[in-house]
Amino acid sequence: DMLDCRTAPTPYRSGLVYDRIVPDGDTLSPAAQTAIVTQYQSLIGALNWMAVSTRPDLTVSVTLLAQYNTTATPAHLLGAKYVLRYLSGSLDHGIAFTSQSASSYLSTTYSWPKDDPLLTTYTDANWGPQDASKPHPGDLITLTECCSLLGSISTRTGGPLAWHVIREPRVSRSTCESEIKSADEGTKVTQFIRHLLADLHMPEITLPTTLWNDNKGAVDWTHNCANKKMRHLNIRNMAVRDAHRCSEILIAHLPGALNVADLFTKEHKDDAHFLRLRNIIVPPRGKFPTPGGC
């Protein structure tokens, strides 16, 4: 029963990195393991509905937890219930849009984003393991946990239109490479939204959509300023350059502290940083813009 649970400041349990939870299915009876998996799948399904619909701040935690839908352990179940504790303390947060750019919570927080009324995309990546740890002799390191998390969010009129978190299928050799892959994923979403805006005859599609990224090397690579260390990138990643060349997107650099896509790339241990980004994307009800809030 989680109706009267204690609230939590973030969806991430301190000291519990999902990728490092040791499976203990061998110590449970088949019936007990089945019961845990069934309860876990039901809970993750409900959380996933919220993460893809109205609560972008849940996306990373739900994405990581969903990897263990068929092999869940009691520790994974505790992690999922911790997300419920976070939700219990943030019920008044939600997505808000406004027709008046200057009154949006995005703009009033600080001078961000740069093109609030227009479609704007932010991308980021977290290179390597979630806890940024270096393996010790004898440690078992899986390929999965070494694959970076790629995140992006597309905003317009002060609120998020689309967001996603994916785990790259292959390990990146550098931070720059993982950021380029993130920009590629963000470009695909941006192009899709631009098609919808074209169907609605929105005038902004005559201009390139700004795509912000906090990695200078990735931005320079998009502008054809590459070096021999990046020659191994494949044709798939070249699609970012092609979209830039065709003026569909304009990739620009912004400081990492201002990149709201950072919310979608890691299990945050800095509560203050997480809450600042959370309040920008899904502001509390008292901060909803008026008129135009929803």
Where are these regions (language model features)?
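Conserved pre-motif C helix in the palm subdomain of viral-like polymerases
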Residues: 32-60, 126-142, 171-195
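RNase H-like nuclease fold core
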Residues: 47, 113, 118-176
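Active-site palm subdomain of RNA-directed nucleic acid polymerases
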Residues: 50-61, 149-158, 189-211
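C-terminal reverse transcriptase regions that engage the nucleic-acid substrate
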Residues: 1-99, 103, 255
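Short, conserved catalytic/metal-binding micro-motifs enriched in Asp/Glu and His
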Residues: 61, 138-141, 145, 261-266
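RNase H-like nuclease module associated with reverse transcription
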Residues: 68, 118, 166-294
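Structured nucleic-acid-interacting core domains from mobile-element enzymes and related host factors
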Residues: 85-125, 204
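Mobile genetic element proteins and their domesticated derivatives, centered on retroelements
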Residues: 18, 47, 55, 83, ...
